[in-house]
Amino acid sequence: MIKRPRRLRTNEVLRKAVRETRLSTDSLIWPLFIVEGKNIKKEISSLPGQYHFSPDMVGKAIEAALKADVKSVLLFGLPKHKDEKGSEAYNENGVLQQGIREIKQRYPQMQVITDICMCEYTSHGHCGILEGERVDNDRTLPYLEKIALSHVMAGADMIAPSDMMDGRIYALRSTLDKNGFTDIPIMSYAVKYASSFYGPFREAA
C-alpha cells in the first residue's frame, strides 16, 4: 500500500493541526454529540457546559467554535433506532450524516472529523458484530468500511476509527482509496489513558 503523507498537507487547517508541538487553538478539536430530532440543545449532565445538538441546531456550536478560533470538530452520532448491526451508522440519511452536511454546507471552512465506531448504534452496545457472546472482528470490518464511506460522502474531511478491530486501518484506507477518497486522512486514536473521564463520555454518547 502506498504511503501518502501529502494527505496531511492538503489544506492550511490540517497542516497547522499536525505540525510540531505548539500550544494554540490550531491544535484543538471540539467533540460534538449529534442527536435525532429538531430544535434540540440539551446539556449533558456529566459534562457541564457540553450539549447534545440536533442537526438543525449544531450550527450554534460551530459559530461558537469559530468565534473561539477552533477550526476542527469531532462528531459522534446518537440515533434513536439501534439494532444488532448498527445500521443507522451507515445510513446515508442518518443523524451523523445529516450533521455533517449541515456543517459543511453552512461552514465549509470548519474541518469535520467523524468517529468511526458501532457502539453508539448497536442494540448490544459493542463496537462490532456479535457471533454468540464475542465480537467477530473480521465480519465487523466491512461495516466499518460502509460507515466511513457514508461519512466521507456526506462531506467529512477526516475519519477517526475508535472501534479497536484488528486490520481496520488497512480496510478503511483501501475502501477510501478505491472510491476516490485518497486525500482523506485517518486520525489515530492510539493514545488512550486510564481515566475517570471515560465515564462522563459514556453518558454523552
Curated annotation (Swiss-Prot):
Active-site residue list: 192
Keywords: Heme biosynthesis, Lyase, Metal-binding, Porphyrin biosynthesis, Zinc
Binding site for Zn(2+): 117, 119, 127
GO cellular component: cytosol
One annotated GO biological process: protoporphyrinogen IX biosynthetic process
Required co-factors: Zn(2+)
Cofactor binding note: Binds 1 zinc ion per monomer.
Pfam families according to UniProt: ALAD
Metabolic or biological pathway: Porphyrin-containing compound metabolism; protoporphyrin-IX biosynthesis; coproporphyrinogen-III from 5-aminolevulinate: step 1/4
Reaction equation(s) it catalyzes: 2 5-aminolevulinate = porphobilinogen + 2 H2O + H(+)
Binding-site residues, substrate: 202
Gene Ontology MF terms in the entry: porphobilinogen synthase activity; zinc ion binding
Highest taxon in the source lineage: Bacteria
Enzyme Commission code(s) on record: 4.2.1.24
Family annotation (PANTHER family): DELTA-AMINOLEVULINIC ACID DEHYDRATASE
Similarity comment: Belongs to the ALAD family.
Record function comment: Catalyzes an early step in the biosynthesis of tetrapyrroles. Binds two molecules of 5-aminolevulinate per subunit, each at a distinct site, and catalyzes their condensation to form porphobilinogen.
Subunit and partners: Homooctamer.
Protein name: Delta-aminolevulinic acid dehydratase
Record organism: Ruminiclostridium josui (Clostridium josui)
